[in-house]
Amino acid sequence: MRQIPHILAALAVVLLNVPAVKGIFVPRHLAWVYVLVLAFSLTYALMPIVKWTARKLDAVDQPGGRKTHSEVTPLMGGAAIYLGFALVLFLAQDMLLFSQELKGVALGATLVFAIGLMDDIWGLSARIRLVAQ
């Protein structure tokens, strides 16, 4: 029952990539609306997969000390957000103009994602994170 919203999000991703549906957004200059809805749907649909992967890699945050959560909490949520962003850029490349600025944002996001992922899995020190980012 808890998976129904994620399944609906996955169906939305499939539906948004049907050429007839995707074509609705192009002539009306709604490409950014398409990107927003697709990115949200992809990210939401990927979240259970990322949570499962985090548990398998033991990339979890244990409760205790100053932490407010009372259960083991999977890390790596940034992976779902990054994958949603990257997949949308790939899926909507025919609708978007890839300026130098957008390429710079994509490169910067990739670097920050890589450092965040390594931190979630291996627990990097604050100094290493600061230097890398």
What are these regions (language model features)?
Residues 1-133:
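"…together with the soluble PPM/PP2C metallo-phosphatase catalytic core" -> "…together
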